[in-house]
A protein has these predicted regions:
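Structured aminoacyl-transfer and RNA-binding surfaces used for tRNA recognition/handling
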Residues: 2-235
Length: 235
């Protein structure tokens, strides 16, 4: 576990005020995200039955927390890692038209995480999925969507600043797009995580493209799911 607490660190908000700020931020963000991307809210499962294929295998090596269900003959259930597959099933089940989608507040447990300031065993994250046409399956549409989400993030940051002026905004006006091969060429002596940290310090907000495919040095920037991530769209 790698937890770093800066010397003489002081909380900017009292614990109870922090909870109020978290609620304000989550409420504002989900409302804006829903309107911006045409998403409807759905309730997410905390666990799914084993063997259904609905749990996200992530990189294919992580083990899910599981338990038997007594009233179902001991069938195994798994706490979700993420909802990547489940969301796509729901898009079909709800017959959601192109240009519209769903979002949920996902809670999960990931026992394999390397614990630090940013990673925990407990995951609480916004998860969303949208139906698109074949024509929209391209990098330009991806970038357009990312810019829309970033705009929501910036608006949420401004809202918090208006309520708590001592929490000053830090995000740049625009998000920077960069391919992982570009990162490799620019920082060949650094590890993938170190490259991410370096480019984030440089630009302030970055969206990485091409994470799972093989790079020119024969390595991958990071692992990606073998059974549902997009490996074919040219990028």
């Amino acid at each position: 576990m790698s937890l770093i607490i800066p010397p003489k660190y002081k909380l900017k908000l009292l614990p109870e005020t922090t909870e109020m700020a978290i609620k304000m931020l989550k409420d504002a963000f989900q409302e804006r995200l829903s309107k911006t991307l045409n998403l409807r809210r759905v309730t997410a499962p905390l666990f799914v039955l084993s063997g259904t294929g609905l749990n996200d295998d992530l990189n294919g090596s992580e083990r899910a927390v599981s338990f038997p269900i007594a009233d179902m003959g001991g069938r195994q259930a798994e706490v979700v890692h993420s909802l990547a597959k489940w969301k796509r099933v729901k898009l079909g089940a709800y017959d959601i038209a192109p240009g519209f989608g769903l979002y949920t507040d996902m809670n999960a447990i990931r026992t394999h995480e390397e614990l630090d300031n940013l990673h925990s065993l407990y995951v609480d994250q916004w998860d969303w999925e949208k139906t698109i046409t074949r024509e929209d399956r391209n990098v330009e549409y991806l970038k357009k969507t990312v810019k829309s989400i970033y705009k929501v993030i910036k608006e949420s940051e401004s809202l918090i600043y208006a309520e708590f002026p001592h929490i000053t905004p830090t995000l740049p006006d625009e998000i920077t797009f960069i391919h992982t091969e570009e990162l490799l060429q620019e920082y060949p002596r650094l590890s993938p995580k170190e490259r991410e940290a370096a480019v984030a310090r440089r630009y302030g907000a970055v969206f990485l493209i091409g994470i799972g495919q093989q790079l020119s040095d024969g390595t991958r920037h990071d692992g990606r799911a073998p059974d549902y991530d997009d490996w074919t769209t040219p990028n």
